[in-house]
Amino acid sequence: MSDNAIHIDIMIEAGNWPDEASLESLVSKSVAAAWNNLGLKSATSELSVVFTDDASIQLLNGEWRGKDKPTNVLSFPAFPVKAGSQPGPMLGDIVIARETVEREAKEEGKPIENHLSHLVVHGFLHLLGYDHETDEEAEVMEAREREILHALAIPDPYAVSDEDINND
């Protein structure tokens, strides 16, 4: 993201999150890796990332997606963007829930920082028009996530371990 200026607003709304500077560093690195991977042109853009808890994200998930349960990440694009096209100056909002992120990282045996980076990348790709409603869309989006996370030295979040195979 060498010539880009993405202004990232970090808001800790609720939950037991690390300090804002640590979160800002993680988000900035994740977003820069995604921007570079996508080969987007230089731009000045704005992004908001809200760090909250399960109760707050459950309300949003119910209101916007009709699902009355917490989730790990929600994305709210400022404007519709077609995957692969240049975004406008306002990207949108990403909301992440602490308890769900923590639980998933523990269940999947991965560092919470790696899982959090993955969710930032996942949410950012949604803001840029990527989705996973169909198998084809999911393949494209997950391939992008793998490439971006690899650039951050984070292992493939979708890899199936031998232990997973043996427990089925």
Curated annotation (Swiss-Prot):
Name its cellular compartments.
Cytoplasm
EC number(s) of the enzyme?
A: 3.1.-.-
**What family does this chain come from, according to its entry?**
Belongs to the endoribonuclease YbeY family.
**KW Nuclease (keyword) present:** yes
Provide the gene name from the record: ybeY
Q: What would you give as a GO molecular function for this chain, any one?
A: metalloendopeptidase activity
Principal subcellular localization: cytoplasm
Please state what the protein is called: Endoribonuclease YbeY
Task: List cofactor names only.
Answer: Zn(2+)
- Superkingdom, according to UniProt? Bacteria
Coiled-coil features, chain-numbered ranges: none
What the record notes about the co-factor is:
Binds 1 zinc ion.
The Gene Ontology biological process annotation of the record reads: rRNA processing
- One cellular component term from this protein's GO annotations in UniProt: cytoplasm
Q: Which purpose does this protein serve, as stated in its record?
A: Single strand-specific metallo-endoribonuclease involved in late-stage 70S ribosome quality control and in maturation of the 3' terminus of the 16S rRNA.
Among its keywords, does the record have Cytoplasm?
yes
Identify the keywords attached in UniProt to this record, alphabetized: Cytoplasm, Endonuclease, Hydrolase, Metal-binding, Nuclease, Ribosome biogenesis, rRNA processing, Zinc
* Organism of this sequence: Brucella canis (strain ATCC 23365 / NCTC 10854 / RM-666)
State where Zn(2+) binds.
Answer: 122, 126, 132
SUPFAM superfamilies with a match to the protein in the record: Metalloproteases ('zincins'), catalytic domain
